[in-house]
């Protein structure tokens, strides 16, 4: 079986790379999408969620924030602000981030950036969900 090369990139560089991907399943703004070797060239907006990476002897989940994908016949590039494999998620740290975001949202302080706090809460909840998939 032909396989796909997957590269997940953040502003800090490449955080996940694999050459033997049989299929990657991800959530785009248009819905769930599966990418396999030979996929037609595609660019799509990605929403906060997870990427399920299927390979010969198993699968992995990676928590990702909003971003974009570019699929070519033999390569999938995912460009996001943050990405973290489920196996590397620090659940306690994610719980602290969730608590911090919730307290910012409850705060009546005019200096609180509500949209930023909502995004932080969404990322923390996503990391906690993906950690459970591991």
Curated annotation (Swiss-Prot):
<feature type="compositionally biased region" description="Basic and acidic residues">
    <location>
        <begin position="94"/>
        <end position="104"/>
    </location>
</feature>
<keyword id="KW-0066">ATP synthesis</keyword>
<dbReference type="Pfam" id="PF00401">
    <property type="entry name" value="ATP-synt_DE"/>
</dbReference>
<comment type="function">
    <text>Produces ATP from ADP in the presence of a proton gradient across the membrane.</text>
</comment>
<comment type="similarity">
    <text>Belongs to the ATPase epsilon chain family.</text>
</comment>
<dbReference type="Pfam" id="PF02823">
    <property type="entry name" value="ATP-synt_DE_N"/>
</dbReference>
<keyword id="KW-0406">Ion transport</keyword>
<dbReference type="GO" id="GO:0046933">
    <property type="term" value="F:proton-transporting ATP synthase activity, rotational mechanism"/>
</dbReference>
<dbReference type="GO" id="GO:0005524">
    <property type="term" value="F:ATP binding"/>
</dbReference>
<dbReference type="InterPro" id="IPR036794">
    <property type="entry name" value="ATP_F1_dsu/esu_C_sf"/>
</dbReference>
<dbReference type="InterPro" id="IPR020547">
    <property type="entry name" value="ATP_synth_F1_esu_C"/>
</dbReference>
<dbReference type="GO" id="GO:0005886">
    <property type="term" value="C:plasma membrane"/>
</dbReference>
<feature type="region of interest" description="Disordered">
    <location>
        <begin position="94"/>
        <end position="115"/>
    </location>
</feature>
<keyword id="KW-0813">Transport</keyword>
<dbReference type="InterPro" id="IPR001469">
    <property type="entry name" value="ATP_synth_F1_dsu/esu"/>
</dbReference>
<dbReference type="GO" id="GO:0045259">
    <property type="term" value="C:proton-transporting ATP synthase complex"/>
</dbReference>
<dbReference type="InterPro" id="IPR036771">
    <property type="entry name" value="ATPsynth_dsu/esu_N"/>
</dbReference>
<comment type="subunit">
    <text>F-type ATPases have 2 components, CF(1) - the catalytic core - and CF(0) - the membrane proton channel. CF(1) has five subunits: alpha(3), beta(3), gamma(1), delta(1), epsilon(1). CF(0) has three main subunits: a, b and c.</text>
</comment>
<dbReference type="InterPro" id="IPR020546">
    <property type="entry name" value="ATP_synth_F1_dsu/esu_N"/>
</dbReference>
<keyword id="KW-1003">Cell membrane</keyword>
<keyword id="KW-0375">Hydrogen ion transport</keyword>
<keyword id="KW-0139">CF(1)</keyword>
<protein>
    <recommendedName>
        <fullName>ATP synthase epsilon chain</fullName>
    </recommendedName>
</protein>
<keyword id="KW-0472">Membrane</keyword>
